[in-house]
Every structure is written in structure tokens, then in C-alpha cells.
């Protein structure tokens, strides 16, 4: 029993496990390797800052779609990063309760990333109230378990 307890404590030092309760990504369970740097295209685990809908410090997993220095361009409500189509920003949430403003065209600031998923109902950086995510809230690189 002691060996199992020590093993679990060591795992918690380096890893975080989280469950995805939405359909924005295909996986349901993810492991986040604490402190592992992320690059464009990686899954990232980060702490939600409570801007809308979910409480502060809920763990979110999204795809890194843009990094500092990348150019976000919005045309109508279509969002592009460095001319790559990311997705369309909806006018309201899937349940119709929230009005959603699209992020503004800009260069992603230093120490920030743009996160998204391909799902049309994903609450991500396409929306002004979410915006880019500061690196201080990034937990690490995420991996889908199942």
C-alpha cells in the first residue's frame, strides 16, 4: 500500500489527469505533463480564468493554433491565423444564453497563445471574452488517453 501511495504522489508531481465533459475534442480523458512546453498543433492544458460560463481554475484542454507573433485576422466572423482558417465565431452560445463577440484582428502578444478546436461550439480564443491565453495559466502539454 505504501508503494502505491508513493507512486501516486510522484505521478501527481509530474502529471495532471482531467476529464473532458464537452464534445469540443474527441477524447474524454487527458493527461497533462506539467511544465512541458507546447508548440503550435499540440494539445495544451490550461487554467480557465472564469471569463464566462465556467468557474475560474477549471482545467481546459484545447489545441494550440497560434503562438506569439502570429497574426489573427477576422473576416466577417471567420478567424484566420497566418492565413490558415481556424473556424467561424458564432454570434451566440449553443444554448442561446450568451452573446459572443469575435476576437479582434491582432498580432498574438508575447507570452500568449491562441487555443481552439475544430468543433463549431468550442468556447475558445475565437471569442473576445476568452481571447489569447497567457502562458502563466498553461499547465503543460496534454495527451489524449481515451
Predicted region positions:
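Short, exposed beta-strand/loop patches in secreted or surface proteins that constitute
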Residues: 21-23, 64, 71-72, 105-106
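Short, surface-exposed secondary-structure boundary micro-motifs
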Residues: 35, 49, 77, 118-119
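Structural motif
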Residues: 39-44, 70, 112, 118
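Mid-length scaffold segments of soluble, non-membrane domains
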Residues: 55-86
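Acidic/glycine-rich C-terminal interaction modules and beta/coil loop segments
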Residues: 89, 95-142
Amino acid at each position: 500500500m505504501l508503494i502505491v501511495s508513493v507512486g501516486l504522489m510522484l505521478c501527481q508531481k509530474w502529471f495532471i489527469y482531467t476529464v473532458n465533459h464537452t464534445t469540443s475534442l474527441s477524447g474524454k480523458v487527458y493527461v497533462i505533463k506539467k511544465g512541458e512546453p507546447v508548440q503550435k498543433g499540440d494539445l495544451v492544458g490550461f487554467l480557465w480564468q472564469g471569463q464566462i460560463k465556467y468557474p475560474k481554475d477549471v482545467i481546459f484542454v484545447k489545441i494550440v493554433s497560434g503562438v506569439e507573433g502570429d497574426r489573427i485576422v477576422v473576416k466577417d466572423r471567420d478567424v484566420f491565423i497566418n492565413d490558415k482558417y481556424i473556424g467561424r465565431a458564432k454570434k451566440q452560445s449553443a444554448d442561446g444564453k450568451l452573446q459572443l463577440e469575435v476576437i479582434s484582428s491582432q498580432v498574438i502578444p508575447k507570452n500568449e497563445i491562441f487555443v481552439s478546436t475544430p468543433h463549431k461550439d468550442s468556447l475558445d480564443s475565437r471569442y473576445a471574452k476568452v481571447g489569447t491565453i497567457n502562458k502563466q495559466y498553461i499547465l503543460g502539454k496534454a495527451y489524449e488517453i481515451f
